[in-house]
Amino acid sequence: MIEQWQRGFVLHRREYRETSLLVDFFTEQHGRITLLAKGAKRVRSPLKAVLQPFTPLLLRWSGKGDLKVLTKAEPAALTLPMHHTALYSGLYVNEILIRVLENQTAYTALFQHYLQCITQLATQPEKLQVTLRTFEFHLLKALGYGVNFSICAATGQPIDAGMYYQFSENKGFFASLLRNHYTFCGKDLLAFEKGDFSDTDTLQAAKRFTRIALRPYLGSQPLKSRELFQAILPHKLKSS
């Protein structure tokens, strides 16, 4: 049994038999973990209203097998208010975490970045694009995606802000005269290195890069959150 309270968030939940739920959590010390919430669907269950996305939780669970049982869950703070585009962006973040994180592997630093990300989505929705790109770069780092944005992979020389570079997966950036989906301006790469997405062109380039970089982790299956976003807010999708 986990004796100490563990901080965590609901990433996703699904029905299990008649009265229970299987809940995917992102926890500070144990990373992503799936727990059985017995009786959580019952009307009088104290878990029914608590197990919601974007609610900071304190958790306890028990069990020795692969599927452990949630024994207690209490809100540590109020649910972060997500609306419209911010809500679907938050669901997107939750979905990619479910898809890419190893089960029961600690990502302590990433947990803090996740907390910062959803807080900013809730409180600063006008900065949504910057918030998402910043989190995606932190996620890639947590996954061990080691790309040097400041050095040319072919020469070992510093990236030139005025030149263009072709991205080669698992190798890095090479000076190139080509202009295609895998080509990036040096000034944008240097901004990536600093985590500076204040420039509009850099922000768009960052979105392009993270989609390329996350593709091997996410696989070919479409993101359900993006499909939902397309169906409900198609006119806003291009800016997210």
UniProtKB/Swiss-Prot annotation:
It comes from the Bacteria. It comes from Haemophilus ducreyi (strain 35000HP / ATCC 700724). This is DNA repair protein RecO. Belongs to the RecO family. GO terms for cellular component: bacterial nucleoid. Keywords: DNA damage, DNA recombination, DNA repair. One of its GO terms (biological process) is DNA recombination. SUPFAM superfamilies: ArfGap/RecO-like zinc finger, Nucleic acid-binding proteins. InterPro entries: ARFGAP/RecO (IPR037278), DNA_rep/recomb_RecO_N (IPR022572), NA-bd_OB-fold (IPR012340), RecO (IPR003717), RecO_C (IPR042242). Involved in DNA repair and RecF pathway recombination. Pfam families: RecO_C, RecO_N.
